[in-house]
Amino acid sequence: MRMLLIHSDYLEYEVKDKALKNPEPISEEQKKGRLEEVLAVFISVEKVDETNPDEVVEKAVNEIKDVASQVKAENVFVYPFAHLSSELAKPDIALEVLREVEEKLREEGFNVKRAPFGYYKAFKLSCKGHPLAELSRTIVPSGEAKAEEEIPEALKKEEEELVSYWYILTPEGELIEVDKFDFTGHENLRKFANYEISKSRIADREPPHVRIMLEQELVDYEPGSDPGNLRYYPKGRLIKGLLEQYVTEKVVEYGAMEVETPIMYDFEHPALEKYLNRFPARQYIVKSGDKKFFLRFAACFGQFLIKKDAIISYRNLPLRMYELTRYSFRREKSGELSGLRRLRAFTMPDMHTVARDLKQAMAEFKKQYKLSMEVLKGVGLTPEDYEVAIRFTEDFWNENRDFIVELAKIIGKPVLIEMWKQRFFYFILKFEFNFVDNLDKAAALSTVQIDVENAERFGITYYDEDGKEKYPLILHCSPSGAIERVMYAILEKQAKLQSKGIKPMFPLWLSPIQVRVIPVSEEVLDYALYVAGKLEGAKIRVDVDDTSDRLNKKIRKAEKEWIPYVIVVGRNEKEQNTITVRRRSDGKQGEMQLEDLIREIRSQTEGFPYKPRPLPLLLSKRPKFRG
């Protein structure tokens, strides 16, 4: 199936003549139709859809729901349109598919019209013309997609049938069945447990961070790409770049060696083929000549292949290797895509540690657990902002209970436990720090796993002190989680504060503009530029509002942009060589020396990376990225 989706002020049609010998029977009323404020969906049902029409209907409805939620459309016009494909389905099947799409959309609560099938029709529409107003989608039944997914049905069935046992573990070491735990005072943990146990990942509403990322001109949808691939405006790119630099510096400081590896890999590589079969995922497929490649969904592949070829001694262990993948790819279901929370292309800080044995692996695991807490603290997320999940087998719990309890003690609050009777995955122990957002959806940030399979699968060995080659254990660690997820968590946290009447703010080191200088008139613009120059020389991101707006409007504009410090300069400040500063954090305003402000800002940003201002100095020189 092929669909063209156009967000329109209106769509109207009028039947002119038969296009088929036996078109759909229609009443006089159905010969004309009109809907306003509508998502117009032009559909070609294709021959391949005949293999599984029910699945095509379901996928099409999910895609339409996804787009409708993004453009906030309640009215949907289903319009048969044969001109999107040269391989059309039989008319009777095509009509049935269109009817099913119409009916299921109605069941989802949409106001739906469908243009009649098998006729020549005149139509008019008025496209709204915003970035998401014109989109196309291709729906492929799984019978066709199966060759690309390369996921053995038996393995998927085995994973689906895996039974999880859920508990809450307290810092005191008490393991309580989740339905018997008193969640009083642990509301976010309750929400997280419900989310994990239900396993529902469909996003039915737009999370607040999407509004913020658009209003602040940070990130936007890219209609020219596949859904889940985003565009970053200058301010968003600065935040993302600083986060990338910060996490990388933390991991290198921890002792990891930074590498770079390819983004695509051969399906037929023996080690990779085994890994794919053991670790089902939805891949993007790339063909080069007769060979088929998949786009990586993690840095594991490249780092494992480097380690396979390396000569490693026990003296080198633990051996830590790191890459910031820009990008990793995973074809998430369209209904699961949600702003910065769940994407198809994402930036993943990925460290893999070769450990000699379980004792060394567990010691590293605890260190990386603490490293992850430290990394999140730097971006403004404390243990109060996220919930912990720890996952393992029953045998591992029985043999290492004190170690697991120690993890709960370190975080200082109850944690969610997922336990299995037997091991299905490649790891024996895993934790994640999960952020619960304003829609009660959870997203994993930091994570570490102890992998007991892939050293042997990839042929990764080390020479022990007895001279023999042995297989190590491997830790997978992302101390922050995907960079986009970190941005999502920061914005969602600020949305929560905003709902409580607290002014939202970025951490100062991440603020795209840290100081705005506002001259009260053009005659003191030269002094405003002098102040800005001094701040810029001290590696502080500063801009100057040189527009003709009134002073109050300039201040409101800075408030809307979450500027941490606003400096107002007039004739008095110029004559006395001082500045008047308004702080967003506490609302206080006062006169001070410029050098004192520089010291104040530098004391808060010390130890964090710096990038220069991402936009022109003067506001009058800036483009607007969103209308």
Swiss-Prot record:
Tagged with keyword Zinc: yes
Editing domain, as annotated region: 1-147
GO molecular function, one term: threonine-tRNA ligase activity
Organism (species): Thermococcus onnurineus (strain NA1)
Alphabetized Gene3D superfamilies for the sequence: Anticodon-binding domain, Bira Bifunctional Protein, Domain 2, D-tyrosyl-tRNA(Tyr) deacylase
Family of the protein in this entry: Belongs to the class-II aminoacyl-tRNA synthetase family.
The keyword Zinc is assigned to this record: yes
Subunit structure comment from the entry: Homodimer.
Pfam families on file: HGTP_anticodon, tRNA-synt_2b, tRNA-Thr_ED
Matching InterPro entries: aa-tRNA-synt_IIb, aa-tRNA-synth_II, aa-tRNA-synth_II/BPL/LPL, Anticodon-bd, Anticodon-bd_dom_sf, DTD-like_sf, Thr-tRNA-ligase_IIa, Threonyl-tRNA_syn_edit_dom_arc
Function: Catalyzes the attachment of threonine to tRNA(Thr) in a two-step reaction: L-threonine is first activated by ATP to form Thr-AMP and then transferred to the acceptor end of tRNA(Thr). Also edits incorrectly charged L-seryl-tRNA(Thr).
Gene: thrS
GO biological process, one term: threonyl-tRNA aminoacylation
Catalytic activity: tRNA(Thr) + L-threonine + ATP = L-threonyl-tRNA(Thr) + AMP + diphosphate + H(+)
Record note on cofactor: Binds 1 zinc ion per subunit.
EC code: 6.1.1.3
NCBIfam families linked: PRK03991.1, thrS
Free-text note regarding domains: The N-terminal domain is an archaea-specific tRNA-editing domain that hydrolyzes incorrectly charged L-seryl-tRNA(Thr). Catalysis of tRNA editing is performed by the charged tRNA itself.
Protein name, UniProt field: Threonine--tRNA ligase
GO CC annotations on file: cytoplasm
